């Protein structure tokens, strides 16, 4: 029986060495150590041995059982290590690879243009002034020489909250508030949000403006032209053509529309500029004495100029945007281009 047990041990160890999975090891464990296993069958024959043989063979059985249990544990551990190593190799992360960058946002084209305009005028000595978007009739219209019967006061053009409270239609009220707070000299720009009852491919009920004001002794129309020409060359390039056309604004006299050579055709004429070769970008003029009267400035002593432009229009021209509504739709496919 001793030889049989040793042969059983050798056979079990040989088969165990061939096992390549934990399931295979478990099957061999059941085959040799289970209730109906090979070793159990041998142990059942111990009763047929003589009293002298029984303890000797019993010790051999225990030795074989211990060796098998140890062998099964060792082989199972080896297989688990192999499986673990294979999985780690398959799931390995190369720590030398660059990290995955988070998608970064960018500034909106309106913000970009506003900051550029502010920077250009800041270099020319203009401070930034701000005012409320909900404005009084006096600051928005009356102090700017817009009488009660002026068309801009119509409900179709202005959002009213009451008889004298409204959403500002331009940032010019900031100029009035600034002049009422301080004596000359004044040199400010007023960027901000304004509101008008209008909405199409080139207009929005809410849009952005930058208006400027300079008041001091001896300010002339030549100063206005020089500053605006320099501003335009900084914004669109020194080779861009500039012209001023006579116009009318209630709060400036004389007044002018400022055009630049079409950024698409460079003044040759195209569909965008309606074959004229020019694009209007802002309005300007010398401050009307009537405005000075409302803020308590002496129009005989001080002169000055004002100008205003729509930031959306500047952005559309600068970046070649065909439809203003793109600036308000928050489409990432569009915004990621800036």
Curated annotation (Swiss-Prot):
One GO term describing the cellular component: cytoplasm
InterPro entries referenced in this protein's UniProt entry, alphabetically: aa-tRNA-synth_II (IPR006195), aa-tRNA-synth_II/BPL/LPL (IPR045864), Phe-tRNA-synth_IIc_asu (IPR004529), Phe-tRNA_ligase_II_N (IPR004188), Phe_tRNA_ligase_alpha1_bac (IPR022911), Phenylalanyl-tRNA_Synthase (IPR002319), tRNA-bd_arm (IPR010978)
Positions of disulphide bridges: none
Swiss-Prot/TrEMBL cofactor(s): Mg(2+)
Name of the protein: Phenylalanine--tRNA ligase alpha subunit
MF terms in GO: ATP binding; magnesium ion binding; phenylalanine-tRNA ligase activity; tRNA binding
Residues that coordinate or bind Mg(2+): 253
Primary location: cytoplasm
